């Protein structure tokens, strides 16, 4: 399975974006538990989850900066 594209994440609403971030963090936690108990079957999922989390956090930061920038311009 290829790594997800950030263009797919850009289509998400702010609420969906936050939900997705929480879901990915939970997934990473579960993967770490599986790794610790030696039950992890697909180690490539770590990379995919971290990559997706980085994309989503980057997008969230971009949106927050854009919102604060537009708020400054309105003053």
From Swiss-Prot:
UniProt keyword annotation of Magnesium present: no
InterPro entries, per database record: Ribosomal_protein_uL29, Ribosomal_uL29, Ribosomal_uL29_CS, Ribosomal_uL29_sf
Record key words, sorted: Ribonucleoprotein, Ribosomal protein
This protein's GO CC annotations: cytosolic large ribosomal subunit
Recorded family membership: Belongs to the universal ribosomal protein uL29 family.
GO MF terms held by the record: structural constituent of ribosome
PROSITE patterns named among the record's database cross-references: RIBOSOMAL_L29 (PS00579)
Record protein name field: Large ribosomal subunit protein uL29
Biological process according to GO: translation
């Amino acid at each position: 399975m290829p790594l997800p594209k950030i263009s797919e994440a850009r289509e998400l609403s702010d609420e969906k974006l936050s939900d997705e971030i929480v879901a990915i963090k939970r997934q990473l936690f579960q993967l770490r538990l599986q790794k610790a108990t030696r039950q992890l079957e697909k180690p490539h999922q770590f990379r995919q989850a971290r990559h997706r989390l980085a994309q989503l956090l980057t997008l969230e930061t971009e949106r927050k900066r854009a919102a604060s920038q537009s708020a400054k311009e309105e003053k």
